[in-house]
């Protein structure tokens, strides 16, 4: 046990942690030359293409140092803000962390939030400055930032390059020297912390865990504490690039368990595994249910695919327990599901995986967040969907979720960023200068304002330099109203949204203009209206396509022409009564892209 080192890598998106992990694997000869490819640990094609890590991964390396063999378990974590619960569980399974900072970009918001998480878990932190081979690297300035953040001596900061492999030996040596061996009692009742699960179509759900106390052996009868379910450990083993079965896994080590579990609901990240015969008295602290933050309706384009969509979502859920869904129906789109996601990136990824892995064409409605409605009778109702709002006469007030956000940016962009946050009803809490030209701004913002396009706008006004991190803070009463879109007087439920009263008129007007561009012209006029309750706040009209019926009259009496025009008008009127307006898929998504 004294030769085991468990560590994770903390970094902001794009600071090169997956590449550096590749170098560590190559250097310790964990991965043979023929298996080597970029981002070895990222299994999904989607992860490689986008260059992001979505799920946590784990891999075991062996390293000889001063004549002794050490086992290093690297637990790779996602860097994106949507997946911060996965990061927190991975961090809890480690004793040390490599803090990777890009020598060209410096410290970013995500780095800081994950670093605080590591410090709370008492991890030994090893600062590494990556990408020092870049021509745009600023090693001295970035070193100043790291020293200021960690308060460590300058000579402790390792310089490395994931691309050239420079500094990799120093990193491995430092891990062995500085990261403490896992603490734990091999004789105590079994306690294993689950930090991830993956779905294998042949063997069911495979849980990855770290043994905190005790020893787990093949064939043991075990119990998952949070769900209370019992299983037999058909196979346990360690994680190299592939799984290597072992007879037992001892205290402090990281491994996997296969026990024929069918659904991901039964394996919760953060849960504890213990023996049925000699159970641990309590679970490992820190387990929490992940609550979805963003909700959207997902509908099949062809309504006959409803059952296929259900099956696809269930399969996705096997691999991604944070995805929730329940059936709902819409007059405009037919039957579909109301899905809950951790954030916008998570939503995009689920959509893309539905398309790639299951060939499902889906329509997604406007994402919204959950609100708490207080009725005049004193009841509290949680609403995920604007259609679920009770009658306005019964509502006392509505609470909406607020987040606490921190934005790190160059001082050049402070003005535009503050304007953006104020436009999103943000409240400035404080601003702190990290170094001469970098500042951290703290805001309280309503989650509903951020959910659509805040991140994209932040990136574009700061030329990609600003970084953003947030966590849910609390619920606060707000003046919200349900905005309906009517086409020829008929409400289209899939386009309804909840907006703040102050922004509703401009939002309604922009929405109508956008829909006017996207809905194709018909044989009759189409009125697009935005309404709050019975009050119309904006209107646009799509003019009818019409034939020149008087073309065949040359000269002659005006009454002849009038007769033909009246006849056409009658026909158009009749068409309008029975005609329906097709809303194209583009129009549902356009709402997300209103500027």
Swiss-Prot record:
GO terms for cellular component: plasma membrane. Its EC number is 3.6.5.n1. GO terms for biological process: positive regulation of translation. It catalyses: GTP + H2O = GDP + phosphate + H(+). It is found in: Cell inner membrane. InterPro entries: EF-4, EFG_III/V, EFG_V-like, EFTu-like_2, LepA_C_sf, LepA_CTD, LepA_IV, P-loop_NTPase. Belongs to the TRAFAC class translation factor GTPase superfamily. Classic translation factor GTPase family. LepA subfamily. It comes from Parabacteroides distasonis (strain ATCC 8503 / DSM 20701 / CIP 104284 / JCM 5825 / NCTC 11152). One of its GO terms (molecular function) is ribosome binding. This is Elongation factor 4. NCBIfam families: lepA, small_GTP.
């Amino acid at each position: 046990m004294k030769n085991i080192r468990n560590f994770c890598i903390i970094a902001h998106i794009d600071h090169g942690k997956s590449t550096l992990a590749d170098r560590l694997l190559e250097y310790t000869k964990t991965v043979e030359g023929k298996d080597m490819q970029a981002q070895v640990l990222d299994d999904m094609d989607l992860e490689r293409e986008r260059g992001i890590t979505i799920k946590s991964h784990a891999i075991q390396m062996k390293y000889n140092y001063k004549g002794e063999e050490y086992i290093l378990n690297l637990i790779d974590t996602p860097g994106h803000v949507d997946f911060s619960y996965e990061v927190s569980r991975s961090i809890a399974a480690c004793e040390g962390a490599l803090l990777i900072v890009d020598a060209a970009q410096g410290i970013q918001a995500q780095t800081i939030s994950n670093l605080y998480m590591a410090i709370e878990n008492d991890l030994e932190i090893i600062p590494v400055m990556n990408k020092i081979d870049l021509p745009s690297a600023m090693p001295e300035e970035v070193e100043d930032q790291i020293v200021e953040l960690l308060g460590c001596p300058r000579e402790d900061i390792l310089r490395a390059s994931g691309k050239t492999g420079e500094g990799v030996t120093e990193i491995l040596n430092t891990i062995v020297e500085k990261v403490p061996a896992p603490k734990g009692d091999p004789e105590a009742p079994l306690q294993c912390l689950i930090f991830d699960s993956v779905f294998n179509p042949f063997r069911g759900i495979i849980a990855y865990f770290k043994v905190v106390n005790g020893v787990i052996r093949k064939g043991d009868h075990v119990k998952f504490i949070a769900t209370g379910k019992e299983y037999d450990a058909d196979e346990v083993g360690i994680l190299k690039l592939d799984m290597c079965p072992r007879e037992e896994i001892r205290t402090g080590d990281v491994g996997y368990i296969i026990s024929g579990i069918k659904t991901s609901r039964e394996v919760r990240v953060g849960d504890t595994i213990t023996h049925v015969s000699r159970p641990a008295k309590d679970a490992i602290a820190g387990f929490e249910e992940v609550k979805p933050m963003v909700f959207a309706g997902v509908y099949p384009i062809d309504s006959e695919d409803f059952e296929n969509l259900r099956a696809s979502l269930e399969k996705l859920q096997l691999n991604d327990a944070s995805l929730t869904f329940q059936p709902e129906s819409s007059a405009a789109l037919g039957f579909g599901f109301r899905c809950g996601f951790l954030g916008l990136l998570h939503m995009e990824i689920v959509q893309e995986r539905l398309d790639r892995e299951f060939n499902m064409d889906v329509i997604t409605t406007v994402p919204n967040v959950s609100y708490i409605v207080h009725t005049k009778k004193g009841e509290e109702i949680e609403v995920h969907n604007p259609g679920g709002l009770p009658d306005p006469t019964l509502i006392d007030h509505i609470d909406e979720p607020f987040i606490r956000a921190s934005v790190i940016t160059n001082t050049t962009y402070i003005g535009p960023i503050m304007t953006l946050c104020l436009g999103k009803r943000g409240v400035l809490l404080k601003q702190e200068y990290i170094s001469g030209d970098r500042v951290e701004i703290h805001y309280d913002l309503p989650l509903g304002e951020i959910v659509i396009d805040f991140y994209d706008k932040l990136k574009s006004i700061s030329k990609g330099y600003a970084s953003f991190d947030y966590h849910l803070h609390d619920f606060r009463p707000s003046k919200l109203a349900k905005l309906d879109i009517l086409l020829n007087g008929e409400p289209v439920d899939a386009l309804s949204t909840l907006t703040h009263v102050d922004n509703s008129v401009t939002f309604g007007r922009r929405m109508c203009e956008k829909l006017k561009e996207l809905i194709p012209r018909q044989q009759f006029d189409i009125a697009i209206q935005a309404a709050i309750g019975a009050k119309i706040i904006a209107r646009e009209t799509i003019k009818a396509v019409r034939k020149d019926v008087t073309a065949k009259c040359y000269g002659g009496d005006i009454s002849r022409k009038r007769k033909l025009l009246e006849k056409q008008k009658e026909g158009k009127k009749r068409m309008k009564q029975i005609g329906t307006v097709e809303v194209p898929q583009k129009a549902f998504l356009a709402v997300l892209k209103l500027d």
